[in-house]
Regions:
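Short, highly charged low-complexity linear segments
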Residues: 111-115, 196-209, 254-260
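Generic recognition of cysteine residues
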Residues: 15, 224-227, 247
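Long, positively charged, glycine-interspersed low-complexity recognition regions
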Residues: 234-260
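FMN-binding flavodoxin-like domain, especially the glycine-rich phosphate-binding loop
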Residues: 1-3, 7-14, 20-32, 41-50, ...
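Iron-sulfur cluster-binding cysteine motifs and their immediate structural context
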Residues: 187, 193, 197-215, 219, ...
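Reductase modules of NAD(P)H-dependent flavoproteins
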Residues: 156, 160, 179-190, 199-200
Length: 260
């Protein structure tokens, strides 16, 4: 099964590639433009993978579904969601958006990965715990693949109880927070070297280099933490005031390889 995905830190990309590869498909980023659209058009079944933000779908993914709704009509979609501590109905939110476009939902899969928020102390865990979470998720993906080959799709996040957990556990309370955060990205001009890594990587083009420094334009930030986790100078924060850890899958992957 081909999987289209959005990934800020690399966690979702890894999971999408693992699932797609094990089901004789390919993983394609929604940021690839025409390739992603052709991937949807050319298949009767497709996977959609994204990280959950406060038990909700990232803004960039919501917009992608809305703008390309006609392509999803009549398609069978398997929703894959990565999460830190809690998701609730992370897959269910995306599934409901897809249903409005005429898609049929095959199932949902929730996958726990290391949290991408590197500027909040309480969300940080030791490397060993992060690596263990990745291993457990890879095993869950393998089980899901075996199950789907027999026509049995997991239903993570799709029940009414999942809906209640997501709505009252996070989403309802954090609507004002999420809206405010879209304008709250902070760039330390003294630390910023103007290298352009953040600007070139921003999926919503909310950052630009002006007069040798990174400048943020508020409003459309999708809260993916890509800029925070890739800035060489650790000059960017969103929720917290200091970058404690840069949370990227390639860092975890390198650590796992070195430990072998």
């Amino acid at each position: 099964m081909n999987v289209i995905y959005f990934s800020g830190s690399g966690n979702t990309r890894h999971c999408a590639e693992l699932f797609a590869g094990a089901t004789s498909g390919k993983a394609v980023s929604i940021e690839s433009g025409q390739e992603a659209l052709q991937t949807i058009t050319g298949a009767a079944e497709v996977g959609l993978a994204y990280p959950t933000h406060y038990s909700d779908v990232p803004l960039i993914v919501k917009n992608f579904i809305a703008q390309n709704g006609a392509l999803f009509k009549g398609k069978k979609v398997f929703v894959i969601v990565t999460m830190g501590l809690f998701s609730g109905d992370g897959a269910g939110v995306g599934a409901r958006l897809l249903k409005k476009q005429g898609a049929k939902i095959l199932g949902g899969l929730h996958l726990r990965m290391p949290d991408s928020i590197g500027d909040v102390p309480m969300l940080k865990k030791p490397m060993a715990q992060n690596l263990a979470a990745i291993k457990q998720t890879e095993q869950k993906i393998a089980r899901a693949v075996d199950s789907t080959k027999n026509g049995l799709y997991p239903k993570d996040g799709l029940s009414f109880w999942h809906f209640l957990a997501g709505l009252f556990g996070q989403r309802l309370w954090f609507i004002p927070t999420v809206k405010a955060l879209r304008s709250k990205l902070k760039i330390d001009a003294q630390k910023c070297s103007g290298c352009g890594v953040c600007a070139s990587g921003c999926p919503t083009k909310s950052i630009a280099i002006q007069k040798g420094k990174a400048v943020f334009t508020p409003g459309s930030c999708t809260l993916c933490y890509r800029c925070v986790n890739h800035c060489p100078a650790r000059a960017i924060t969103l929720i917290g005031k200091r970058v404690l850890e840069q949370c990227r899958y390639d860092i975890y992957e390198k650590t796992m390889k070195e430990a072998r």
